[in-house]
Amino acid sequence: MIHHRNRNIAIMQLAIEELERKVSTDIIISVAVDEFGINHKPKIEHLVNLMDNAIWEE
């Protein structure tokens, strides 16, 4: 199960980085919440925002 989660995190990071922000963070958050559960939504939002901010700083 952890292997799948690592893969899914990598896919979400790829979507943010390689698609040049064409995929909105709202969509990525929604998909991650579906994958990991609503209890993790605050942490997911925080991580997605950190990744998004890091991309804008490059």
Segment roles from a protein language model:
Residues 5, 39-41, 51:
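General structural signal for secondary-structure boundaries
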Residues 1-30, 47, 54-56:
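N-terminal acidic leader/helix
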Residues 33-44:
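Short, basic interhelical loop/turn and adjoining N-cap
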